Regions:
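Catalytic cores of phosphodiester-bond-cleaving enzymes
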Residues: 114-140
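Loop/helix-junction capping segments adjacent to catalytic residues or to phosphate/diphosphate-binding pockets
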Residues: 109, 145-146, 306-307
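Basic- and aromatic-lined ligand-binding clefts that recognize polyanionic substrates
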Residues: 132-156
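Structural motif corresponding to the early beta-alpha repeats
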Residues: 37-114
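Active-site beta-loop-alpha junctions enriched in small/polar residues
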Residues: 17-23, 46-50, 70-76, 105-107, ...
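Histidine-acidic metal/acid-base catalytic patches
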Residues: 2-16, 27-34, 56, 61-62, ...
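Surface-exposed cleft-lining segments at the edges of enzyme active sites
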Residues: 74-75, 104-111, 135-143, 197-209, ...
Length: 362
């Protein structure tokens, strides 16, 4: 089994999305750089071309903090130029990033052997570079989680290709399957918070939502046993959280609650899939199985409509007449830092429990 580790072995690196995602000029990236540096966050860039990544790396808070890049979402490894694109990123940035993330594909099901063969060829090419970053295959196409774990088992011997476990994607898939099993195939994502049936079905919805944590823990258990480095995309979600800026049900903060137009158990909100306690269990489980040297976390939380005064960074936006988007960016960055604290606290708990376990064996 491959035991190769990333270069941040003393503590698992914690990264976050490093993007604008809010309209404005490069002052927003300067703001992100300052806030990431203050928090000690690593950077996960989204880049479709090497030239785009070169520009983004100019805003990297520090060369000492870990960095990874998420390649374009529609990358199809069966297209002739795609493996070469992966190799180009690896060769050009191998001294500046430790990982590259791409989405999995539905062909994992329909062309399993062919997909594995492509990954084996990519792994051989990455190995020939020397010092190549990892290629992490993210669970994103919505296939059966069992098929995803089968894929990783089939490439367990590869040195440079491993998994990106997106806990939000896997959690939502588990919720959908759980709800459908007990409701004659009904899709929980067809329900909206304003629907009349929601109030009566709230208990059953939350029962399905509460099952997501165990579903993700099972995937971590299976893949963790392979002994390969794993990258994690961390974010929360809920089937009724469909009114966000991107119209999706996940990429929420672990501190978010889901507002509802009625009272449920004395509150006018629902809990998301994980929350801080679920996140803590996921982080500690990962560290127990993998150790910090084979674990990396990235907060993939999207912006909300909140605003936060610019304060000490207002000088970056003197040329802006309307500071609204700058304040929205500042708020989003504060959310990332708050969630980073949750992850780091969970890591500390994991370290303490591991130390206690070792003491028990002395």
């Amino acid at each position: 089994m491959n035991k190769r580790s990333h270069p941040f072995a003393s503590r698992p690196p914690v990264l976050a999305l490093f993007q604008k995602r809010i309209d404005g000029d490069d002052a927003l990236l300067h703001l992100a750089s300052l806030r990431f540096k203050d928090c000690g966050l690593g950077t996960e860039f989204y880049s479709e071309t090497p030239e785009e990544l070169e520009k983004l790396l100019m805003f990297r808070p520090s060369t000492e903090t870990p960095a990874a890049v998420h390649l374009k979402r529609g990358l199809d490894l069966f297209e002739s130029g795609s493996p070469g694109m992966v190799l180009e990123f690896a060769e050009r940035f191998r001294d500046r990033i430790f990982g590259m993330i791409i989405h999995d594909q539905t062909e994992v099901i329909s062309h399993f052997d062919g997909y594995v063969s492509v990954l084996r060829k990519i792994d051989a090419d990455l190995k020939s570079l020397g010092g190549s970053p990892y290629l992490f295959i993210e669970y994103a196409a919505g296939i059966e989680p069992e098929s995803f774990t089968d894929l990783l088992k089939a490439i367990a011997d590869l040195d440079h290709v491993s998994a990106c476990i997106d806990i939000g994607h896997i959690g939502l898939r588990h919720i959908r399957d759980t709800f459908a099993r007990v409701h004659n195939g009904k899709d929980i994502f067809s329900i909206k918070s304003i629907d009349p049936e929601v109030q009566d079905a709230a208990g059953e919805i939350q029962m399905a939502v509460g099952s997501a944590l165990d579903g993700v823990l099972q995937v971590i258990e299976k893949l963790g046993r392979l002994g390969k480095p794993i990258h994690f995309h961390l974010h929360d979600g809920h089937p009724l959280a469909q009114a966000g800026a991107f119209g999706i049900s996940d990429h929420l903060s672990f501190l978010d609650k889901i507002p509802i137009p009625f009272e449920y158990r004395g509150r006018r909100h629902l809990d998301p899939m994980f929350g801080p306690s679920g996140l803590s269990r996921l982080v500690r489980k990962s560290l127990r199985l993998l150790g910090p040297e084979r674990t990396s976390f990235s907060l993939e939380i999207h912006p909300t409509g909140g605003r936060l005064p610019l304060g000490d960074v207002s000088f970056l936006f003197h040329h802006w007449v309307d500071k609204g988007n700058a304040e929205r960016m500042n708020f989003w960055l504060s959310v990332l830092c708050e969630n980073q604290k949750l992850v780091l606290k969970s890591c500390e708990k994991g370290e303490l429990s591991e130390a206690a376990r070792k003491d028990d064996h002395l």
